[in-house]
Amino acid sequence: MKFKITLLLTLITNIIFAQVDVPAKYWIEDSNFEEKINAHHAFGDDDKLPIVVEFWASFNAANCFADWNKIENAVYYRVDISKAPNIKKEYRIRMAPTIILFKGGVKEDMWKAGLDLMLPTDLNEIQEAINEVNTASRF
């Protein structure tokens, strides 16, 4: 019984802090999604920063992308799929977490959780993809 209570408290804490650790300015929804993924320019159209969007769900908050604040040379956003049904449908989000890398509003790469609800990637792989997209856009 003590184990069950400890487990329940751990899960509740993870759910609460998984959403809280990402400030409100990084959360997007149906109404501002297109604007956000198309808005980040460094110096002009060729220098748009890539956008990393994590599709998140409270039921799987424990498996969220915890290293979001370590991403370099890109902008990060998080979408609560329960509050963004149109985006979820458009990008065929079936599992959370799912991460999509955009450049200039175009989907460049995608990582989806499997049936185990675990994200099959890490910060290094995502950063590598960001670096490749940034390098490719210079030519």
Model-derived regions: residue spans:
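Solvent-exposed loop/turn segments at secondary-structure junctions
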Residues: 58-61, 83-86, 94, 106-108
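Structural recognition of the beta-strand scaffold that forms the well-ordered cores
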Residues: 51-54, 78, 98, 110
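Boundary at the C-terminal end of the N-terminal hydrophobic targeting segment
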Residues: 18-20
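Structural micro-motif
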Residues: 91-103
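Local sequence-structure signature of Cys/Sec-based thiol-disulfide redox active-site neighborhoods
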Residues: 26-72
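ER-lumen resident redox/N-glycosylation machinery signature
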Residues: 62-71, 76-88, 113, 127-130
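Sec-dependent N-terminal signal peptides
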Residues: 4-14
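Non-catalytic, surface beta->alpha helical segment in thiol-disulfide oxidoreductase systems
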Residues: 101-139
